[in-house]
Amino acid sequence: MIDGDGFRPNVGIVICNRDGQVLWAKRYGQHSWQFPQGGVDDGETPEQAMYRELYEEIGLKPEDVTIMATSRNWLKYRLPKRLVRWDSSPVCIGQKQKWFLLQLDPGRESRIQFGCHGHPEFDDWRWVSFWYPVRQVVSFKREVYRRVMKEFAPLAMPVPAVQVNKKDGRRNRPR
């Protein structure tokens, strides 16, 4: 399904843990890493597509995660001209994405597996610092990643504990 402007509706998934780290997945047989993502099928809501992609790509089910946020807007990126399939109809020039911030529920990390539905999209994963993906994702996705991570940061980043200064009793945030 491609819209009238040539963009394919898609969902992106940021999975975080309680330490504010995010799941970073390595594309199958490649050296590139990204967040899980995938197309929205006809008749499917973005949330339904997210849960389907979550299972197909990462092996997680709805009971393994908690939805913390959904992006306010659809975020678009254009594909580099060399990646556009000009002979297809209609021509897809990029993706428009609705993003979801999920928290992996405690004790569910062992359920992460690849290839639950056909050919695996990924062959490795790791926890990385929250902002790491913005610098590391393929260049044409960086602006979308920057925007979505900025939107999700207040919810995903752990709030530092307040410490009381023993000398004068004032409250300080750790540096």
UniProtKB/Swiss-Prot annotation:
The UniProt entry's GO biological process terms, in alphabetical order, are:
mRNA catabolic process
Cofactor field: a divalent metal cation
Q: What is its EC number?
A: 3.6.1.-
SUPFAM superfamilies to which the protein is assigned, alphabetical = Nudix
Q: Which UniProt keywords apply?
A: Hydrolase
Asked if the Swiss-Prot or TrEMBL record annotates the protein with the keyword NADP, the reply is: no
Top-rank taxon:
Bacteria
Q: What positions does the record give for the motif labelled Nudix box?
A: 38-59
Listed InterPro entries: Nudix_hydrolase, NUDIX_hydrolase-like_dom_sf, NUDIX_hydrolase_CS, NUDIX_hydrolase_dom, RppH
Q: Where is the Nudix hydrolase domain?
A: 6-150
* One annotated Gene Ontology cellular component of this protein: cytoplasm
Q: Which GO terms describe its molecular function?
A: mRNA 5'-diphosphatase activity
Q: Which PANTHER family match?
A: M7GPPPN-MRNA HYDROLASE
Similarity-based family: Belongs to the Nudix hydrolase family. RppH subfamily.
Main function = Accelerates the degradation of transcripts by removing pyrophosphate from the 5'-end of triphosphorylated RNA, leading to a more labile monophosphorylated state that can stimulate subsequent ribonuclease cleavage.
Record protein name field: RNA pyrophosphohydrolase
Q: What is this protein's gene name?
A: rppH
